Amino acid sequence: MSWLFGLNRGQPEPPGVPGFPEPPSPPGGSGDGGDKNRPKDKWSNFDPTGLERAAKAARELDQSRHAKEALNLAKVQEETLQMEQQAKIKEYEAAVEQIKNEQIRVQSEEKRKTLNEETKQHQARAQYQDKLARQRYEDQLRQQQLQNEENLRRQEESVQKQEAMRKATVEHEMELRHKNDMLRIEAEAHARAKVERENADIIREQIRLKAAEHRQTVLESIKTAGTVFGEGFRTFISDWDKVTATVAGLTLLAVGVYTAKNGTGVAGRYIEARLGKPSLVRDTSRITVVEAIKHPIKISKRIFSKIQDALEGVILSPRLEERVRDIAIATRNTKANKGLYRNILMYGPPGTGKTLFAKKLAMHSSMDYAIMTGGDVAPMGREGVTAMHKVFDWAGTSKRGLLLFVDEADAFLRKRSTEKISEDLRATLNAFLYRTGEQSNKFMLVLASNQPEQFDWAINDRIDEIVHFDLPGLEERERLVRLYFDKYVLQPASEGKQRLKVAQFDYGKKCSELATLTEGMSGREISKLGVAWQAAAYASEDGILTEAMIDARVADAIRQHQQKMEWLKAEGKESTKEIGKNPLQPLLEGTPV
């Protein structure tokens, strides 16, 4: 016991105390060299002075009065050290237990991983077994299919062989039958020839008798027929009443055939002139039998309708409106007094109201109107002259008077001196000039053209009044915008039957703005704007026409109008270049009639 000698008093663990086992020393000795520096004798370095000091201390302790207290203190220290060692032992045991638990957890984890791996291996093995089974099954199916195909091929080969054998048998039978037939026919021919050779004199006698009888029969028939016809003709000639009746009947038959043939043609032309419509006329207000049958209500409304204002729905400048109103009044008075109508030429840009005014003029004057286009004349070729005469013949049969409106008249009423006009078109133009050479109280001729300078001089001579329809000004454009906005937008929206609504904005102000933006546009282009607004509203999801949609359509129309103007300028430059190539061409054009 070292504590008895006063040694190692501050150490936490006295030597030789039973309890926590000391860890073994590492193999190979201490770090100071191992067996190399270890002494050969274990008692060679023993120091006996320590024992002497211990013995001396023990004697002093026994002689001291505090020996008992020192002993108790040593016991207490020893107990404290033992308790500390026990606590360390418990900690060590807890650490060992934790290590065991960790080992158990690791073993469980390894076992779980092993089980998972075994499960995967089992699954892989099962999948592989299933794959092998499927492959075996597919191989079996393939083998079975190959076997079936082989059996089928063998059956087909067997059938083909049987069919070949059957065909060979049939061919052999046919060949034998043919040989037998040939032998039979040959035998019959030999027998027949032998019989004919033996009976040749009898056969010749029979033929001779039949020919004599036939000749006698024919001669007797000719004699009998001649006698009958001769007696009949003699009887017919002797009776003059029969001769007269026969001649009269043949004459009446010939006259009837000729009359029916020519009368049908005359009746057809009369019906076509009175009731039909010529092929050149595209549109007419004149009532025909076919239209009366197809549209009886429309025809009845037209008959009983009141006289309309000539400028109703037509928006023109004040000066032009005053002039065309005078023309309408003069035409109406001419119709009432059965005077001679005046021919009018209306020229100007397209879409300025020429066709609309012609229709309104006819309705205002209680006249029928017929519209034909100049572009329909040229394709007719040689039939153009006949068609032109049919138009004027049909116009002359109108009881109310007819306003014949020729739209795009410059398409066929060109100068005859130019090389571009064909002979058929030249003949049609001559027919037109012939039928319009004098004033008429049956029809009124109204020509419309965008290029009146291309007219033949004789056409200009037949015109009594020239009216220029210019593009609408600011005031006219505003009236047109308001008219078509009301017609295509406001009226459908107010009826409530259609899917069209208008957003809230100042309509009057917007119409004034649009009139300013649409400078240079014609009335037709403005009307198309109204249709575009309506289409935009129908195309929207909610059916509401907004101010932005109106502005977008107007901007698009302005861009298109500018593009058209650029094309027109380019075309004008090209025509100017062509005229510059032949400076004598304007002097050669025009042939007065």
Curated annotation (Swiss-Prot):
Please report the name of this protein according to its UniProt entry. Answer: ATPase family AAA domain-containing protein 3-B
Q: Which domain of life is it from?
A: Eukaryota
Query: Which residues lie toward the Mitochondrial matrix compartment?
Result: 261-593
State where composition is biased (Pro residues). 12-27
Question: What gene does this protein come from?
Answer: atad3-b
Catalysed reaction(s)?
A: ATP + H2O = ADP + phosphate + H(+)
Source taxonomy lineage?
Eukaryota, Metazoa, Chordata, Craniata, Vertebrata
Cited function: Essential for mitochondrial network organization, mitochondrial metabolism and cell growth at organism and cellular level. May play an important role in mitochondrial protein synthesis. May also participate in mitochondrial DNA replication. May bind to mitochondrial DNA D-loops and contribute to nucleoid stability. Required for enhanced channeling of cholesterol for hormone-dependent steroidogenesis. Involved in mitochondrial-mediated antiviral innate immunity.
**Coiled-coil intervals, chain numbering:** 51-215
Q: Where are the transmembrane segments?
A: 243-260
Q: Which Gene Ontology molecular function entries are recorded, alphabetically?
A: ATP binding; ATP hydrolysis activity; protein serine/threonine kinase inhibitor activity; zinc ion binding
Q: How does it assemble?
A: Can form homooligomers. Homodimer formation at the N-terminus may be regulated by ATP and is required for the interaction with the inner surface of the mitochondrial outer membrane and correct mitochondrial homeostasis.
Q: Which residues bind ATP?
A: 348-355
Q: Which family does it belong to?
A: Belongs to the AAA ATPase family.
Mitochondrial intermembrane face of the membrane: 1-242
Q: Where in the cell is it found?
A: Mitochondrion inner membrane; Mitochondrion matrix, Mitochondrion nucleoid
Instruction: Please name the GO terms of the biological process aspect recorded for this protein, alphabetically.
Output: mitochondrion organization; negative regulation of PERK-mediated unfolded protein response
Q: What are the protein's UniProt keywords? A: ATP-binding, Coiled coil, Hydrolase, Membrane, Mitochondrion, Mitochondrion inner membrane, Mitochondrion nucleoid, Nucleotide-binding, Transmembrane, Transmembrane helix
Q: Which organism is it from?
A: Xenopus laevis (African clawed frog)
